[in-house]
Regions:
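A conserved FAD-binding loop/helix module that cradles the flavin
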Residues: 294-332
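Predominantly flavin-linked oxidoreductase catalytic cores and closely associated redox partners
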Residues: 102-104, 116-189, 193-204
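FAD-site-proximal beta/loop scaffold in flavoenzymes
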Residues: 144-158, 255-304
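Beta1/beta-strand and adjacent pyrophosphate-binding region of the FAD-binding site
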Residues: 2-14, 162-167
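Residues at the starts of beta-strands that form the adenosine-phosphate
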Residues: 5, 28, 163, 185-188, ...
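A Rossmann-like FAD-binding core segment of flavoenzymes
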Residues: 88, 92-113, 120-123, 182-273, ...
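Glycine-rich, N-terminal phosphate-binding loop of Rossmann-like dinucleotide-binding domains
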Residues: 11, 130-131, 253-254
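Beta1-alpha1 glycine-rich phosphate/pyrophosphate-binding loop at the start
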Residues: 11-89, 174-202, 271-272
Length: 333
């Protein structure tokens, strides 16, 4: 078994940033990713445009270019592939981490690859940078397991001419509803709040509000889906329950980090926010030797950490780890 100074779990932008900063300091690291490199970005809508500018997505001091003011998904995927190759990061794709055993300085990370073959990686330190996009917030209603229920919106074409419901009231729900509407789907928006969230981007909100006002997109506020059936959905409204004809349901209800994995591995979480307790200077958890990076630091408040600020976690953690390893301290001396 190859021994590494650090195992980084997750190869999204934050995980890549950790790998880069460790390599810059001469700290050996392997990144283990359950999907492909930047798997969450790969699963974004096909034609998605970021709400930010290229320089705010950059890692490793490698410039990102875009044909427009805001980069799109394809440009981001190309950029992170290029950065990974430039730094020659050791990334094990399509390999899922099952558990972490051992203690600070003598961990073993256990995983299984896509063929089910087990692997073990001895390491002195571990960084959790798993993100949250692979765990949707479920509706917990009958019928949610039907194939017509979709938690990850990709593109509108397959839903042309169909009756679709979009659940949610934030950016992803608004964008999904508009995209489906403009492509010829019959769209109903269902949201438990009084109105669309104020967090919906300023250039999107008036657009969807006008479509709702004109009746082009039907909307039920202060409402929720209570039952999903093969060709319909039952919606609970303030007045009564309404049965709607339905072909597809897009549950744009957000996502959450793998809190169970952290708890099972001795990482204590705040009971209310579910934020892990970490040292703010090193992002080390209360389980000594395990550091957290990216959105995991925010617990259930996933709207606080983005690529734009999570990318800086790598430098902070790498500096702390490099300073703690005996061979690096000896080299400095």
């Amino acid at each position: 078994m190859s021994r590494f100074d650090v195992v980084v779990i997750g190869a999204g932008p934050t995980g890549l940033a950790c790998g880069i900063e460790l390599k810059r300091r001469g700290v050996s690291a392997v990144l283990i990713e359950k999907g492909c490199v930047v798997n969450s970005l790969y699963n974004y809508p096909t034609n998605m445009v970021f709400f930010t500018t290229p320089e705010l997505l950059e890692i490793g001091d490698i410039p990102m270019t875009s044909l427009n003011e805001k980069p799109n998904r394809t440009e981001a995927l190309k950029y992170y592939r290029r950065v990974s190759g430039y730094y020659d990061l050791d990334i094990r794709q399509y390999e899922r981490v099952e558990s972490i055993s051992g203690d600070d300085g003598a961990f073993v990370v256990h995983s299984a690859d896509r063929h089910g073959c087990p692997h073990a990686y001895p390491a002195k330190k571990v960084i959790l940078a798993m993100g949250y996009y692979d765990r949707p917030n479920l509706l917990n209603v009958p019928g949610e397991d039907l194939p017509k229920v979709i938690h990850y919106y990709k593109e509108p074409h397959p839903y042309y001419g169909h009756d679709v419901a979009v659940i949610g009231g934030k950016n992803s729900a608004a964008i999904t509803a508009l995209d489906l509407h403009w492509t010829g789907a019959r769209v109903t928006l269902i949201h438990r709040g009084e109105a669309l969230s104020n967090s919906v981007k300023y250039w999107i909100k008036p657009n969807i509000e006008n479509r709702i006002k004109s009746g082009e997109i039907k909307a039920y506020f202060r409402s929720s889906v209570v039952d999903i059936r093969l060709d319909s959905i039952l919606v609970g409204t303030p007045e009564d329950e309404v049965l709607l004809k339905n072909d597809f349901v897009f549950a744009m209800t957000g996502y959450h980090p793998d809190l169970g994995f952290m708890s099972a591995h001795g990482i204590r979480l705040d009971p209310e926010s579910r934020r892990p307790y970490t040292d703010p200077e090193t992002l080390e958890s209360e389980r000594k030797g395990i550091h957290l990076a990216g959105v995991l630091v925010a617990g259930m408040h996933t709207n606080e950490i983005f690529i734009e600020n999570g990318r800086f976690h790598g430098k902070k953690i790498a500096e702390a780890i490099a300073a703690s390893l005996p061979q690096h301290n000896e080299a400095r001396g």
